[in-house]
Each structure stands twice: as C-alpha cells, then as structure tokens.
Amino acid sequence: MNKKYFKKYSWVLILSTSILAPMTLASCNHNVAKKEDKTQNDSSNLSNKTNKSDPNDHLKDKDKNVSQDNKDSTNKAVSNENSQTQSQKTNESSQNTKDDSSKTSNLITNQNSSSNTKSKIQENKQSQKDQNTSAVNVSALEKQTKNDENISLVNSKDTNVILKNDEKVALAKDDSKEKSKNSSNLNLKTPVENRQNKNEVKDDKKALQWWQKLNESASILESFSYDQTSLSLTFKEGMPLGLEVVLKLENLDSHEEKEISFKTTNGKVQNVLLTSSNLTSGKWKIKSFSFDKTYSHSPTIETTFDFKTNEKLKQERIEKIQKAIDKYQIKIKQNYKDKPLISKYALSNFDLNLNFKDLEIVNNSLKFDGSNLNQDLKSEKQMKITFEKVSENQANKTRKAHFKITTLDNLVFEKTLEWSYKTNKEYLDEFKNGSALWDDLQASLTSVFEKSLWHPYQLPKAKSKINTINLINDVSASFQGYDYLDDFNGSAKLKFKLQRGQEQRDITFTINGFLKVSLIDPLYKGNLRNSEFDVKASSNGYWLGQYYTAAEVFKHYSNGKSYWYATANDGNPWLEFS
C-alpha cells in the first residue's frame, strides 16, 4: 500500500472514531432515561393501587408510599448525577479524541513532510475540517444531555403532584383520624424540610443585634449608677436573656484594669454585683464592655464611681459610729455622784440623753435606734447601751463609769464618763454640833423620847427603835449603848457608830428632853415620902447585919437607911416608885 492510500485510511479511521463515540454516549443516556420513565410509571401504578385499598389501612399504605417515593427520588437523583457524569465524560472523550487526532495528524505529517509539501497542505485542510465536525457533534451531544435533564425534572414534578393528590384523598376519606395523621406527618418530615429548619435557625443566629447595627461612636448606655455594692446599667434598648457581657474597669489612680463578666436578664436595666469582684478601694470607671466577646463598646457617658471594699466600708462605718459616740454626752445624776458603794451603781443613775420618753431598762441595758444617738446613724438599727461598772481613784477622788455600746451585728464600742466625788470619810467627818448630819440624828432621837414621855432610865425600852437610824447622805447610826444618865437634868449621853459605805466612825451624842427627877422633899422633913409614893423593888438585900429595903429610902434621912441594897443574886435589880 503506498503512502497516499495509507494516509487516507488513517484519516477515515480517526473520523469514524470521533463520530461514533458521541453517538454511543447519547444512546446510553437515552437508555437511562427510559429506565427512569419505567420507574416513574411503576411508582404511579403503586400509588393508584394504594388509593383503591381499604380506607382503614391508608396510614400504613401511606407510610409505604412515602418510603417508596423516597427511594424513587433517590434513584432519580442518582440517575441525574450519572447522566451529568456521563455527559462530562463524553465531553472529555471528545476533547481527548480531538487531541489524539491532532497528535496523530501531526505525527503523520512530520513523517511525510520530506516527500511531498503539497500533500502536507491538503492534510492540514482535511484535519481542520475534521475538528470542526467533531465540535459540531459535541455541541449536539450537550444539547441532548440538557434535554434529558429537563425531562427528568418534569417527571419528578409530576410525581410530587401525584403524591399531593394522594394525601388529599386520604384526608377526605378519614377525617376522624386527622390528629393521628398530623402526628405521623410530623414524624415523617423529609430531609429537605429538616435542612430548611436548620437553615432558618442559622439565619436567626446570623441576625444582627440592635447594638451591632450602631457605629462605634453611638451611645448605647443611657444611664449609670452605683450603690456601694452593685452597678446599675440602663441600656438604650432591652437586652436578651443570657447574653454574656464583659465589663473592663480601670482604676483612675493606679491605672489597674479588671474584667467582670455577667449574664444579662430581659430588659434595659442590668445590675452587676461588685461584692466578689476583688476590686481595690479607689476611683474606677467603665472603660469598655463587650457582648459575646465579639462586639466592644466604650461608654460615652460618665461612668466613674468610688469603690470601697467590704473592709473599707466596715472601717468607715466603725469610724462614723465611733465619732458619734465620742460626741455623745452621758451625765451622772447629781444625787448619785457620791454613792457610798460603787458596786451599787446602775444604768438608771445616769442621764443617757437618748430622747426617750419612757426608758425600758432591762438588766442594766437599753435598746435604741442609731438616730436617737446621732442623726448620722440612721442606718444603724437596734443598738444597745449596757452599763458595765464604776471604778474610782481615791487619791484623785475621781470615779469613772464604763459603758458598752453594741450594734445589731455585734460591733462593740466603749464609752466612759468620769467625775469627781466626795469620799465616805469626808461625809462622816462632817458629823459635829450644828452640822446637817448632827441635826438629823438629834431630831430622830428626840422624836422617839419626847413622844413617849420617858425618863432617862427608861432608855432600854427604846433600844429597838434606835438600834439603827438612817440619816441623810446615806449615813447610818447604830446604837452602841449608854455613856451616862442625868435623871435630875433629864439628859443622857448615848454611844453610836456612824457608817457610810465601808467607812465607820464612833461618836457620843447627848440628848435632852427626858422627864426630870426633881427633889421630892426639898426641906428634908421626910414626912411626905411614905404617904406620897408606893415603892417597889426587885429585891431587898442584907448588909452588915441590917436589911436595906427600897422603902427605907423614902423615909427621913435621919433614919440612916437612905439607900437600898438588892440581893447579891439579883441579876437585874430595879426600883419603882409611884
């Protein structure tokens, strides 16, 4: 075979391959489309059979139809994908064919270039025609593939229409089981619906919040306040529930920065507790705050506040209470300044100056509100003052009262009151003729004896009444006995022990006003004694061979027995005349 015929034969073979390959692919796509049509017809027949079945079983059949429809839909999707894949392969094959044809043509041309220049030109023209023919075939194949895809989409839509008609027929046949079917429909959501719901949720999350729509210079914080324990932030619009907000605070003195995070509540006003923030005492301001760690904003209003730690607040509170207590004035009542015993002092002995109408003192304690003590202590409720004790310095002659003032949370403060006093010894040393204490004792004794019209010798009868006499200035006088009696003058000198507190003093005190024993027989005639008096005695004794009776005393002095003896064994001799 000569070279000329060999070249022609080669070109015929190449052209045949270029034409037959696209036709073969188109035939395959046509067969696939026929199979899909057959599948759709089977699905339609199955749906019609379902409509003719027992109405009581329509739910069960519907489940099967939905399952079958899902399978058909899946098969169609696979078929469409295969068709598209096959079309792509056809295009690639056509392109490869063109490349191979071009390579073969170039190879043959190069081999025969040395023999015939004219043949080479003709061959190039023929190659250009073949390429144009191949491009036309590829374009026809692509159009055929698009037509197949359109037919597949139309068939899919027809299938969906048939399914919807089936559902309407089932609803019309069994209205009594509508709720059950709705429940089944909810459980039989297609994957497409689920994907749509997920997309809606994602769209909601992607929606911008109101503060994200504002520029950085816009103000989103309307107002700000601070109450020693928390910050109150009022935003321009309401905040959603559970949004994480991070506040960045800056100390204006030390430039220290702190971050505080909190979760928002529904509404415009948000409260941020600072009790556990570990902030140091000083002036702070809100430097910025961020939402969900993505959007940051710097306030455009004044947000400076003077933060104080719990220790600082407590210290200031203690100082305020102590300052009020230092100004608080307690006074000792005048008549209690010189009490004999300091152990006998009580809270009632002091003027507390608490603006109380009725003092309810219990166990030397009194409850009151802080405002009664000082107007700066209005926040202090149920304070209490308790009397502790009184101490004294005898050398300086001063006494000091000790009080304890407590708050409701058991903060304890001390208050003292000091004053000068008069000692017990000084009071007892004042007992002398003409003093108030002297006159008081004299008046007390005189009232006893003058009212009784007693003689001095009758003082023993008064002992029970003068055993202890309470005098002024807390002084007491205890009767100790007689010093002497003066019957003729109606006077007696008595012994007493004065006492004030632990201090004592022995005194003698002469009183007058007793009935006097006058001279019965001033002329000593003695003739009136026996006739005027009845004489009685406890006993009559014997002395030196003679009896000395009481009656002998009232005889004339010349009798020689002008005195009376009692017997030796008379333990309590007495003489009575009337």
UniProtKB/Swiss-Prot annotation:
Membrane topology listed for this record: Lipid-anchor
Sites of S-diacylglycerol cysteine lipidation: C28
Compositional bias annotation for Basic and acidic residues: 51-74, 172-181
Leader sequence segment: 1-27
Gene Ontology CC: plasma membrane
Keywords from the named record: Cell membrane, Lipoprotein, Membrane, Palmitate, Signal
Region: Disordered, residue numbers: 35-135, 172-203
Residue spans of biased composition, Low complexity class: 108-119
PROSITE patterns, per database record: PROKAR_LIPOPROTEIN (PS51257)
Effect ascribed to mutating N41S: In strain: KD735-15
Pfam families: Lipoprotein_17
Keyword Cell membrane: yes
N-palmitoyl cysteine lipid attachment residues: C28
Subcellular location: Cell membrane
Keyword Signal listed: yes
Composition bias, Polar residues: 41-50, 75-96
Family of the protein in this entry: Belongs to the M.pulmonis LipAB lipoprotein family.
Name the record gives this protein: Lipoprotein A
Gene that specifies this protein: lipA
